[in-house]
């Protein structure tokens, strides 16, 4: 599909707030319709990175933590922010080690350059499937995070997504994309066998 011919035009911009993770900018713009419009944009300094790990028994790993914006506990796949000076894969490898204490011998990109909430933020996301897992405690955990880690079958993780127990959008995308690839023959045979082991 082609892009729309008319783009937004920026008349002026100012930084409203900034810290090490985000910058909030306010724009005076002309919309594609020609109307003047005020636009607020949250610029993310890091990439969003996620990992769907599969162990030798066909289980994946859910990480539980208290999420500040909604004031509730959330079960998610390992995910976090990736520094801009390293590749998405390197960042995902670090997240898997930090949150789950694991490394993987095999990696497959699951999602590339996904726009997380493109009406208000420029956050971009990459996600990977990881298998051939072994322990890796070379990275210290984030001091602001108190994490719980559980291993569940891939099928059980999907059930928790279907039931609404899992609400994190990035986790839902990873689970459903992996399930689609599993059903359509888009995964390496060894990985597919692991994921189907407990279905």
Residue spans for each PLM region:
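Nudix hydrolase/Nudix homology domain
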Residues: 2-8, 73, 84, 110, ...
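Conserved Nudix-box catalytic region and its N-terminal flanking loop in Nudix hydrolases
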Residues: 3-7, 42-45, 50-94, 98, ...
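Acidic, metal-coordinating catalytic segment for phosphate/diphosphate chemistry
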Residues: 12-50, 56
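Active-site segment of metal-dependent pyrophosphate-handling enzymes
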Residues: 23, 43-46, 55-57, 67, ...
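Short, well-ordered beta-strand micro-motif
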Residues: 26-28, 53, 129-131, 151-153
């Amino acid at each position: 599909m082609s892009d729309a011919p008319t783009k937004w035009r920026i008349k002026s911009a100012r930084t409203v707030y900034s810290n090490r993770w985000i910058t909030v900018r306010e724009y005076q713009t002309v919309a594609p319709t020609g109307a003047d419009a005020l636009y607020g944009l949250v610029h993310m300094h890091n990439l969003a990175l996620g990992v769907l790990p599969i162990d030798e028994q066909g289980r994946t790993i859910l990480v539980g933590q208290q999420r500040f914006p909604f004031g509730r506990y959330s079960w998610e796949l390992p995910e976090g922010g990736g520094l801009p000076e390293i590749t998405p894969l390197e960042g995902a490898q670090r997240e898997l080690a930090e949150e789950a204490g694991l490394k993987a011998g095999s990696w497959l990109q699951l999602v590339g350059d996904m726009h997380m909430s493109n009406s208000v933020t420029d956050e971009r996301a990459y996600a990977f499937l990881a298998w051939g897992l072994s322990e890796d405690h070379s990275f210290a955990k984030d001091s602001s995070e108190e994490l719980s880690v559980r291993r569940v079958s891939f099928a059980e993780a999907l059930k928790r997504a279907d039931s609404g127990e899992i609400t994190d959008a990035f986790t839902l995308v990873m689970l459903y994309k992996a399930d689609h690839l599993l059903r359509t023959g888009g995964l390496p045979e060894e990985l597919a066998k692991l994921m189907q082991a407990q279905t």
